[in-house]
């Protein structure tokens, strides 16, 4: 989607009004809403079905080719193998579903991604795949601000935005397999 991004930016008031809908996401029985691979820089391809690999992450995505400032050797960060964003949060900032993939995440879910609901170590089972929520922070960037507005980026960085994980979560692959749009998501939290 290439467009005049500024035409779609929402005001701080409009964003604040939508937070209750994000908070109302299911805690335990979610659903996969969208799967996206990034085959090349700036490209997005939506999938109905995706393969997830223990090493590659989402097959066809360039995650494995991207370096990270968070790894000693500058290689890909294994704790950010697959990124997951709330479909309610992306709908809040992006509006039209055709713009969701611009957020740059790979899996969009209708599930409460908040820190209280999904502490580090929580396992998400979707389709045949298991993803573990990692402590690696998932934060907004200049591209996010350009596409969705500075107010959207600011909201993700507020205490509420961070607690709700509006920008999403990072995960690593525990079990490879197939995932499909429409798959249910089961949540297994770590033992206390």
Task: Go through the PLM ranges and name each one.
Residues 1-192:
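Metal-cofactor-dependent catalytic cores
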């Amino acid at each position: 989607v290439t467009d005049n991004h500024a035409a779609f930016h929402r005001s701080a008031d409009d964003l604040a009004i939508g937070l209750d809908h994000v908070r109302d996401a299911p805690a335990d029985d979610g659903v996969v809403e969208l799967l996206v691979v990034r085959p090349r820089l700036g490209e997005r391809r939506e999938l109905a079905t995706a393969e997830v690999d223990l090493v590659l992450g989402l097959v066809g995505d360039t995650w494995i080719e991207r370096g990270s400032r968070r790894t000693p050797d500058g290689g890909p960060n294994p704790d950010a193998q697959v990124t997951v964003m709330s479909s309610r949060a992306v709908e809040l900032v992006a509006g039209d579903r055709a713009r969701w993939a611009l957020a740059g995440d790979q899996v969009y879910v209708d599930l409460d991604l908040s820190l209280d609901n999904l502490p580090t170590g929580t396992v998400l089972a979707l389709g045949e795949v298991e993803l573990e929520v990692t402590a690696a922070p998932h934060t907004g960037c200049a591209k996010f601000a350009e596409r969705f507005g500075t107010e959207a980026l600011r909201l993700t960085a507020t205490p509420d935005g961070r607690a709700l994980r509006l920008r999403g979560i990072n995960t690593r692959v525990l079990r490879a397999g197939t995932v499909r749009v429409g798959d249910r998501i089961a949540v297994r939290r770590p033992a206390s």
